[in-house]
Amino acid sequence: MQQSTVVPVDMKVLMNHIYEYKKGVRRMVLFTFNKQYEDVAIRRLESQNIKYVIQPVGSDRLNLYFGREECLNAIRMIATRPLNLLTPEEDFMLGAMLGYDICAQCERYCERKDRKGS
């Protein structure tokens, strides 16, 4: 009888992100996942020579950015605190870098600026 290995959803999502990155669909990825998979995620990226930056999110989750070195250099300067504390400008830049819909990013930026009264 063949024994099947169950791959956690977090790891399936990571593998899909890596696939898209390697195919050129994305230049940078932000993946938020349970801290228990940190070693597996890092081993997977390092085995494929993919650069990354990792940041804690609360006590049990991590933000894993990976992709092109020039993008990660910018991330190291922009994402220096929790994402919900980014300025509207930093939030906009991060969304654009991640390839989010630019019109939606513009709308989000304007809403955040209006909320801050800036």
Over which residues does each language-model region extend?
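Domain-length accessory/inserted modules outside core catalytic folds
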Residues: 1-118
